[in-house]
Each structure stands twice: as C-alpha cells, then as structure tokens.
A protein has these predicted regions:
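Short acidic-glycine-tyrosine-enriched beta hairpin
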Residues: 50-70, 155-179
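Hydrophobic, ordered structural segments
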Residues: 42-91
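C-terminal functional regions that serve as terminal interaction/effector modules
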Residues: 148-151, 159-176, 182-200
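A short, N-terminal "cap"/entry segment at the start of jelly-roll beta-barrel domains
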Residues: 1-17, 77, 81-123, 200
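Surface-exposed interaction/gating patches
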Residues: 6-8, 106-156
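Glycine- and acidic-residue-biased ligand/ion/polar-headgroup-sensing regions
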Residues: 27, 36-51, 135, 141-157, ...
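The feature marks the first
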Residues: 4-8, 15-50
Length: 200
C-alpha cells in the first residue's frame, strides 16, 4: 500500500498468519476498513496512530482482539511495532492505554526495576519496564519472551540492544528459564511480553 512501509521481525506460517512487524505510516496514509480475524496488538513508537477507537500518540499500547474492525491511518505519520495473529481465538478484550498518562510501580522482587502493567491473563504478561542505569536485570522467560527497546539500551550475552532493537527468547532459552541483562548508562525503557510462545 502506498505510504506504508514494513520491516518484518518475525513470522510463523507461510501466509503471514502470525507476524511481528515494524510499520511506518507516511503522513496522510490510511488503510481501507478491515477486520482482524485473529487480532492485532501494537505499540506506537513515533507520531500518532489513528483509527475508529481514537488517536494514539507515541507510548500507546493497543490490543484489538479477534473479529475487531477498524480503519487505521495517520494524518501526521507514525511508526508502530505490530503483532498480528497472536491472540487466543476466544479473546475479545480491547486494550487502549496511553502509557504517558499512567505511573509505573517498583518491582518488589527486582532492585532497579519499575513496571507499568499493560495486559495479563493465563497465557501472557505484557508490560513496560524501566531499568535503572547500570542495573543487572533478571527476567523469567518460561513460556518465551519478547523485548522491544523503547528508550535507552541494555546488554544481553555481549550484544548491545539500543532504541528500536527487538529480542525474542524462545522456550528453554536457558536452564532455569531466566535471562540476565545489564542496563546501559542511561538505563532502559523496554516493552516486554512473556509466556506467549508455548503454542509454537
């Protein structure tokens, strides 16, 4: 579609049934109205995403469940990280959160970590975490994990992940199902989703 560019991060299945992509909308671009039979979930990384449900600035988190319908676009332009086809078939829960308007809370089990919960059920846990500069972070990864760096940076197994980096940790990533990261000099703000890869 003219005015919409994509960079695919991950795909399961030959026909894009389950895909994770970074999408850039040029100013004034719009899709035609359509239904998401298997749902969509996204984070607004830049600009303002617009659809039938509202205008969502950078920092917003949205879940449009299976059977939902909308006409997405962006008058000023935007960039989103979007996940398609990764819902339970009977999920009908909408989520629209502007994380700029809600506070984070300290994680009582991990020093140097603050959390903004976004969504949680028996299958997955989605949140934004804020990591203090230089903090050593442990993350439970049973069920798999995905991380997208919104700001700052962190190190994982010698690799530096900076803003707009994406990391996917599969099932049985490490013994004990724990990953360890080192936050960078400016700390890190990371979108995290865990527990959702058990059905792959």
């Amino acid at each position: 579609m003219a005015g919409v560019d994509r960079r695919r991060l991950d795909r399961v299945g030959a026909n894009d049934e389950r895909v994770t992509t970074v999408v850039r909308y040029a100013p004034g671009s719009h899709f035609s109205p359509h239904t998401h039979d298997t749902g969509e979930e996204f984070v607004v990384l830049d600009g303002v995403f617009q659809d039938d449900y509202g205008h969502w600035p950078a920092g917003s988190y949205v879940r449009n469940p299976p059977t939902s319908r909308h006409q997405p676009g962006s008058e000023p332009g935007c960039v989103i990280m979007v996940k398609l086809g990764q819902f339970q078939a009977d999920d009908r829960t909408f989520v629209h959160i502007d994380t700029n308007k809600i506070d984070s809370v300290p994680d009582s089990n991990r020093v140097g970590v603050w959390v903004t919960p976004l969504y949680k059920d028996q299958y997955e846990n989605v949140r934004v975490e804020y990591w203090d500069a230089g903090a050593t972070i442990e993350l439970i990864t049973d069920g798999g994990a995905e991380l997208f760096v919104l700001n700052g940076s962190f190190n994982e197994s010698g690799d530096e992940l900076v803003k707009n980096s994406w990391l996917r940790l599969p099932l049985n990533y490490k013994a004990g199902d724990k990953a360890s990261f080192q936050a960078g000099a400016d700390g890190a703000k990371v979108w995290i989703k865990t527990g959702h890869l058990t059905d792959l």
